[in-house]
């Protein structure tokens, strides 16, 4: 049954983050999701991963893979289905003005940061990488810029010391889904307000790539620990041993001094100081990083305690990791 004050919505999204918002809209909302546009099928090791394709199928929503469509095709479809509003969540492509102009209420975007900080495609990961203590969700009225539109709603979210991109994303989904429902109600009632962003405070969250996940031991232990959490569950921080890629799923910063392990004043970053059941202690550009959860190529994720039972020779003290 269609609610008398429901909106006809087209949903644009690609990631699991988007899929959870679609799930909430389709499951709890009185609004009609007429069509879903997505870039491509995605997979993830995150336990909370949700497929946007499965959600569309479950709720019998027409799904279009936009990489196989031209802009003119998308424009034609949007006009034909006669939507009131386009909702964009983690879509990954910029919508041209021709599409933004079609819905009578325009297009809104649910973004995983406190805009204008961390505009761009990887706001959750960059907030963790740079050691932010707080982030949040911002819903904006879209314009042609990258996350530059006026703010409809904004809500903060604390970042905890052991948060990964996966755990932080899970909390942001809950916040974003609730906020989206509120904003849609405001559109129906005509009670929404728009607040311009102050671009002098803007930062940009560049897209992640696999190569930046390679551990640079010249960075500080604090920086590396942040990167390991930021790049979990993708692309996963890694280093090399014997031509094997070793992925690092968890680590912590040691409060011990290098002098506790060696009297040398010229230890190379990447040098293993000790390999204990509780972790592998590695010299960095500043401080010691303790590796606690690792994964050898083709093997399961395992604790260092279990790993050393079979690969102790790989982690001898004074050897240098690549």
From Swiss-Prot:
Reaction equations catalysed: L-methionyl-tRNA(fMet) + (6R)-10-formyltetrahydrofolate = N-formyl-L-methionyl-tRNA(fMet) + (6S)-5,6,7,8-tetrahydrofolate + H(+)
Organism: Blochmanniella pennsylvanica (strain BPEN)
Residues that hold (6S)-5,6,7,8-tetrahydrofolate according to the record: 113-116
Any GO molecular function: methionyl-tRNA formyltransferase activity
Function according to Swiss-Prot or TrEMBL: Attaches a formyl group to the free amino group of methionyl-tRNA(fMet). The formyl group appears to play a dual role in the initiator identity of N-formylmethionyl-tRNA by promoting its recognition by IF2 and preventing the misappropriation of this tRNA by the elongation apparatus.
SUPFAM superfamilies registered for this protein in UniProt: FMT C-terminal domain-like, Formyltransferase
CDD domains: FMT_core_Met-tRNA-FMT_N, Met_tRNA_FMT_C
GO cellular component, one term: cytosol
Protein name: Methionyl-tRNA formyltransferase
Gene3D superfamilies listed in its UniProt record: Formyl transferase, C-terminal domain (3.10.25.10), Formyl transferase, N-terminal domain (3.40.50.170)
Lineage: Bacteria, Pseudomonadati, Pseudomonadota, Gammaproteobacteria, Enterobacterales
Family the UniProt entry places it in: Belongs to the Fmt family.
Keywords (A to Z) from UniProt: Protein biosynthesis, Transferase
Top EC class for this record: transferase
Enzyme Commission number, as recorded: 2.1.2.9
């Amino acid at each position: 049954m269609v609610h008398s004050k429901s909106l006809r919505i087209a949903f644009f999204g690609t990631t699991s983050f988007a899929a959870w918002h679609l799930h909430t809209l389709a499951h709890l909302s009185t609004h009609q999701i007429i069509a879903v546009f997505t870039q491509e099928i995605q997979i993830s090791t995150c336990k909370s991963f949700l497929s946007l394709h499965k959600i569309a199928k479950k709720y019998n929503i027409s799904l279009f893979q936009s990489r196989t469509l031209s802009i003119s095709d998308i424009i034609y479809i949007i006009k034909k289905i006669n939507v009131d509003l386009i909702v964009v969540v983690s879509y990954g492509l910029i919508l041209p003005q021709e599409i933004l102009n079609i819905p009578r209420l325009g297009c809104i975007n649910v973004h995983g940061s406190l805009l204008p900080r961390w505009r761009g495609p990887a706001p959750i990961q960059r907030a963790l990488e740079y050691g932010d203590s707080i982030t949040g969700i911002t819903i904006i009225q879209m314009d042609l810029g990258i996350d530059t539109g006026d703010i409809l709603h904004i809500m903060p979210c604390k970042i905890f010391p052991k948060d990964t991109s996966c755990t932080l994303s899970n909390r942001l989904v809950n916040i974003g889904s609730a906020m989206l429902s509120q904003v849609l109600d405001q559109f129906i009632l005509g009670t929404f307000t728009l607040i311009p962003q102050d671009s002098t405070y803007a930062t940009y969250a560049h897209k992640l790539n696999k190569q930046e996940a390679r551990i640079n031991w010249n960075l500080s232990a604090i920086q590396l620990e942040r990167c390991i959490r930021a790049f979990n569950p993708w692309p996963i921080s890694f280093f090399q041993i014997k031509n094997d890629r070793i992925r690092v799923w968890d680590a912590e910063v040691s409060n011990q001094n290098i002098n506790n392990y060696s009297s040398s004043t010229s230890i190379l970053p990447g040098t293993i100081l000790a390999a204990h059941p509780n972790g592998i202690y590695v010299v960095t550009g500043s401080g010691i990083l303790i590796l606690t959860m690792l994964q050898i190529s083709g093997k399961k994720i395992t604790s260092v305690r279990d790993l050393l039972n079979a690969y102790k020779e790989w982690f001898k003290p004074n050897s240098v990791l690549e």
